């Protein structure tokens, strides 16, 4: 934390006994890849910043809520943060451990030292003072909560789209006697060896967990509620994502989608034959509209075709020893894994007029201006909410940090002019 002044009252409307720390630079909420990218770019511009993080270290999602076999689903060239490339000895698709080493090295390189175990409980704009007021609660080793208020002209929301787990409300879920967990708690299929496991969800995580379960001697069943696009991770020896990005420079998105689906059918065959219906919209069009990514196959598809991974319909209800599906069939299971994703927690703490975020914590549509993809009113910025992954987060971080640094430099120049009078 740089360039701060400590005050007593603060005028923030919170606990009068809590300190208020007035910051010269922005306050960044979140020390994941997005927050680190903003901080690093501000460092490059010579501007101060303060990062607050609710967990005990950087990249909490990657450290504590991912499975062991996870790799980046896109080639490393599309996942680099600003200013630093991946080491040349890293594989094309880095493991989660590779990526964590990269992130920790990145933080050290730019001397980013987040204030850890600070959970933001409220952030609001103080119009009379022209400052963002951010209240955090810190739990120390003695389990005593410490409330602190920070004040800054700029607030960067970098807490991400994956802050809270999503578990669907399914009738009878509490009655299921077997183990039930969210995918954030899954590490390896070893503990499920010999068990019948229902995986609810057919995204990239659900598919890869089914693959992992198979490889560890479990019997996975994947519950599919809606259509899903499965694409080979590579086409013609190159990354499917990379090919799509190149084609989009010259062709409309619908035409690129047709090409991807044609090649996917040639490589994978007819996915609907095995219970995976394709949506009416193409994979890139869906990604553009909803942010939902297609599945990039890393081996699960061949096990679906061979019957080692079985596709089942949407779950209607749970019983003590299994599940009933919407087609009326019932099956017994030893465990259930909800690979049902995450959501933003921004609405629980950010108080704004809805100009930047929806009530669900998603980034509001930018309309005709791309500016609103990363900047809101009164010095409010967001990074990592555009649904474009690490590549998009890096681009947003560059723009947000450059904008903040320019405004900070203006305030410094104005202060220097006043002091020289």
From Swiss-Prot:
Pfam families: FMO-like
Function, in words: Involved in auxin biosynthesis. Converts the indole-3-pyruvic acid (IPA) produced by the TAA family to indole-3-acetic acid (IAA). Seems not able to use tryptamine (TAM) as substrate. Probably responsible for auxin biosynthesis in leaves and involved in the regulation of lateral leaf growth. Required for maintaining water homeostasis and an appropriate root to shoot ratio. Required for the inhibition of root growth by ethylene in etiolated seedlings. Functions downstream of the ethylene-response transcription factor EIL1.
Residues that hold FAD according to the record: 30-35
Listed EC numbers: 1.14.13.168
GO CC, alphabetical: endoplasmic reticulum
Stated name of the protein: Indole-3-pyruvate monooxygenase YUCCA8
InterPro entries linked: Auxin_biosynth/cation_transpt (IPR050982), FAD/NAD-bd_sf (IPR036188), Flavin_mOase-like (IPR020946)
Keyword NADP listed: yes
Chief localisation class: endoplasmic reticulum
Family: Belongs to the FMO family.
Binding residues annotated for NADP(+), in chain numbering: 201-206
């Amino acid at each position: 934390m740089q360039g701060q002044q400590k005050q007593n009252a603060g005028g923030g409307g919170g606990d009068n006994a809590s300190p208020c720390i007035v910051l010269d630079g922005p306050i960044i909420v979140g020390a994941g890849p997005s927050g680190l990218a903003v901080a690093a770019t501000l460092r490059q511009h010579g501007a101060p910043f303060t990062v607050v993080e609710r967990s005990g270290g950087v990249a909490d999602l990657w450290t504590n809520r991912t499975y062991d076999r996870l790799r980046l689903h896109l080639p490393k060239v599309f996942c680099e943060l600003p200013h630093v490339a991946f080491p040349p000895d890293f594989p094309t698709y880095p493991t989660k451990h590779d990526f964590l080493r990269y992130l920790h090295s990145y933080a050290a390189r730019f001397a980013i030292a987040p204030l850890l175990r600070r959970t933001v409980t409220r952030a609001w704009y103080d119009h009379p003072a022209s400052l963002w007021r951010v209240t955090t609660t810190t739990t120390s080793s003695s389990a005593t909560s410490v409330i602190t208020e920070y004040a800054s002209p700029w607030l960067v929301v970098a807490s991400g789209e994956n802050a809270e787990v999503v578990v669907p409300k399914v009738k009878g879920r509490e009655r299921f006697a077997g183990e039930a967990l969210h995918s954030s708690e899954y590490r390896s299929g070893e503990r499920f060896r010999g068990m019948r496991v229902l995986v609810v969800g057919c995204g990239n995580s659900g598919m890869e967990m089914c693959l992992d379960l198979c490889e560890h001697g479990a019997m996975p069943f994947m519950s599919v509620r809606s259509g899903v696009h499965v694409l080979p991770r590579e086409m013609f020896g190159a990354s499917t994502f990379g090919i799509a990005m190149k084609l989009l420079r010259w062709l409309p998105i619908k035409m690129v989608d047709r090409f991807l689906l044609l090649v996917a059918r040639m490589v994978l065959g007819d996915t609907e034959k095995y219970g995976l219906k394709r949506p009416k919209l193409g994979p890139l069009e869906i990604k553009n509209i909803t942010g939902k990514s297609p599945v990039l196959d890393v081996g699960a598809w061949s096990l679906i075709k061979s019957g080692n991974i079985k596709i089942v319909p949407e779950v209607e209800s749970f019983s003590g020893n299994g599940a009933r599906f919407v087609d009326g069939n019932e099956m017994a299971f030893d465990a259930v894994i909800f690979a049902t994703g995450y959501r933003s927690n921004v609405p629980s703490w950010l108080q704004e007029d809805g100009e930047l975020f929806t009530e669900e914590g998603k980034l509001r549509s930018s309309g005709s201006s791309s500016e609103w993809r990363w900047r809101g009113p009164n010095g409010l910025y967001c990074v990592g909410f555009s649904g474009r992954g690490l590549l998009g987060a890096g681009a947003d971080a560059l723009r947000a940090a450059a904008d903040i640094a320019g405004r900070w430099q203006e305030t410094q120049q104005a202060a220097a002019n006043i002091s020289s009078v």
